[in-house]
Amino acid sequence: MVPSREALLGPGTTAIRCPKKLQNQNYKGHGLSKGKEREQRASIRFKTTLMNTLMDVLRHRPGWVEVKDEGEWDFYWCDVSWLRENFDHTYMDEHVRISHFRNHYELTRKNYMVKNLKRFRKQLEREAGKLEAAKCDFFPKTFEMPCEYHLFVEEFRKNPGITWIMKPVARSQGKGIFLFRRLKDIVDWRKDTRSSDDQKDDIPVENYVAQRYIENPYLIGGRKFDLRVYVLVMSVFAECLLWSGHRRQDVHLTNVAVQKTSPDYHPKKGCKWTLQRFRQYLASKHGPEAVETLFRDIDNIFVKSLQSVQKVIISDKHCFELYGYDILIDQDLKPWLLEVNASPSLTASSQEDYELKTCLLEDTLHVVDMEARLTGREKRVGGFDLMWNDGPVSREEGAPDLSGMGNFVTNTHLGCVNDRKKQLRQLFCSLQVQKKASS
């Protein structure tokens, strides 16, 4: 399955046109024959099992009608369990769109993500040299457990005293994670997994990754945080939120699902910043050049991670995907990729969060373009910017420099001022004029 030809990164974000195997060859075809076909339908039939902000956005979209049970649908925002059980034997007409790629887990399972990134780094070193391969050095040293246990022990003994973190490869929201510094802790864990496997031969041992813990995270007010950036494959969500740890440095897991278990958790108090606020804060502390370098490095994470799976993602024109990238910044302003989520939470934790996710989802639907209004030549749709088209995309000549930094030519606006409503009005008015002129 192929993500759409345009890997777009969300409001306040950047867009990526995916590498070849991740292209939707029919993206540009949304305009003519498909458009006429869709205009003949009275409505777009949608289905979803997610009762959150997404449902509100879908129900309020003009011309969209909800279908339930096994009724025919044109657009299905499904969960990954449905995909796993039904995708291979579900017939879909050409116009139908579904919200996941068949093997999205090549990027979203922690062990597969690391495996693909390591393989891609070696490929770059062979084909383009060490300098280019070094652009993949954005994930901590990681080992899959238990199959790489002996390699891990060798690395552990080379660097005594550092902290490691163990994560289940297929779980989310901070479940099953623990920190350790002693080899005895991992030996005990290994014994536990072996004994449970001996007792139940039909249940496989749950795989983990052992990952070097980032011990010098950037702190704001003494608090650790990570960034959640939404990436639509097809742009980077610019008004994405900065997930701030709710306690001081003793809170190691900055996942909002974990923060909600804190006794003093309050959804309206300082748990999240917008990325725009974060960027302004960093610029005041470190200057615009350092901040531009940081955000350029974050853009590199999106591009290289998608390129790492271009040979393994199954291409399908029916599919798109909204990924949630979790990124940690260290004290040297270096970004680290922690994980990629196939089902980022679309449930709002506050009114501000609800408004942000509403904009994110509305723009996602604009880019997926079930209504066939786009031409396929757009570089920006609402909060989404086209960032990659078999190579980096430059800003249009005469476009304002929203970063305020000058000489910023890449078509990316992560954390910049984002008047998406004005942009959408201008875009759809222009498309309407073009349509009338051609009819």
UniProtKB/Swiss-Prot annotation:
Residues at which a protein binds: Q173
Site positions per UniProt: Essential for specifying alpha-elongation versus initiation step of the polyglutamylase activity: Q173
Listed EC numbers: 6.3.2.-
GO terms for biological process, alphabetical: flagellated sperm motility; microtubule cytoskeleton organization; protein modification process
The protein, known as: Probable tubulin polyglutamylase TTLL9
Keyword Transmembrane: no
Binding annotation for Mg(2+) 2: E339, N341
Residues at which Mg(2+) 1 binds: D326, E339
Cellular localisation: Cytoplasm, Cytoskeleton, Cilium basal body; Cytoplasm, Cytoskeleton; Cytoplasm, Cytoskeleton, Flagellum axoneme
Description of its domains: Gln-173 is the main determinant for regioselectivity, which segregates between initiases and elongases in all tubulin--tyrosine ligase family. A glutamine residue at this position is found in elongases TTLL6, TTLL9, TTLL11, TTLL13, TTLL10 and favors glutamate-chain elongation, whereas an arginine residue is found in initiases TTLL2, TTLL4, TTLL5, TTLL3, TTLL8 and favors initiation.
Cofactor requirements of the protein: Mg(2+)
Binding site for L-glutamate: R248, K272, K357
